A protein has these predicted regions:
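Glycine-rich flap/beta-hairpin and adjacent strands of clan AA aspartyl proteases
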Residues: 147-158
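Short, small/hydrophobic-residue-rich motifs at membrane-helix boundaries and re-entrant hairpins
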Residues: 1-146, 162, 166-169, 173-176
Length: 176
């Protein structure tokens, strides 16, 4: 006789959709504006970092292709430049970590998000992420930064989520 037919299984239920019961989702423009505001808070450290690079490079010794020293540079100023670079980098890291982990990890908002009136919440529970979850979400942003497609994702995504939002199951909502 003929082999038995494969059993028929019911189809999978449709993917859970965001039910708009609370505040609207934040626009991509609001998210970009919040990021730019956050960067303004880091501007002094960024300037220090850039000045440090410039001073270090301009005052570094240079050699010819044969290894002959062409310009001895100014070691004192070169080290000053490297110190400024390091201080600027540490400043950017400290400001960024405080803004994202201490503020957003406790309130769902960075300085920029607060100014724009948006907040990060868990997509399913509606609660603010923990500091650890906020750290993981930020790490996902860094992993995606090589191609930046995740940052553009909200432009066509119905949930307006970035790559990191998708992985962490978060949404950014408008609160004012």
């Amino acid at each position: 006789g003929a082999p038995a037919a494969y059993p028929i299984y019911p189809s999978a239920p449709p993917a859970q959709q965001w039910v708009q019961t609370g505040p609207p989702l934040a626009s991509w423009g609001d998210r970009v504006l919040a990021t730019l505001i956050d960067m303004l808070y880091q501007l002094p450290a960024i300037v220090l970092y850039m000045v440090g690079i410039f001073v270090a490079v301009i005052n570094a010794p240079t050699t010819s292709t044969r290894g002959v020293v062409v310009n001895r540079g100014n070691p004192g100023l070169m080290w000053l430049g490297l110190a400024l670079l390091a201080i600027g980098m540490l400043g950017m890291m400290a400001i960024g970590l405080y803004n994202v982990l201490a503020l957003q990890g406790k309130t769902g908002q960075t300085w920029g998000k607060k100014r724009v009136g948006i907040k990060v919440i868990h997509q399913e529970t509606g609660v603010i992420l923990s500091v650890g979850q906020t750290f993981l979400r930020q790490l996902c942003h860094y992993l995606d930064s090589a191609v930046y497609i995740g940052y553009l994702w909200p432009l066509w995504d119905p949930m307006r989520q970035t790559f990191a939002d998708k992985l962490m199951k978060t949404v950014v909502i408008k609160i004012k």
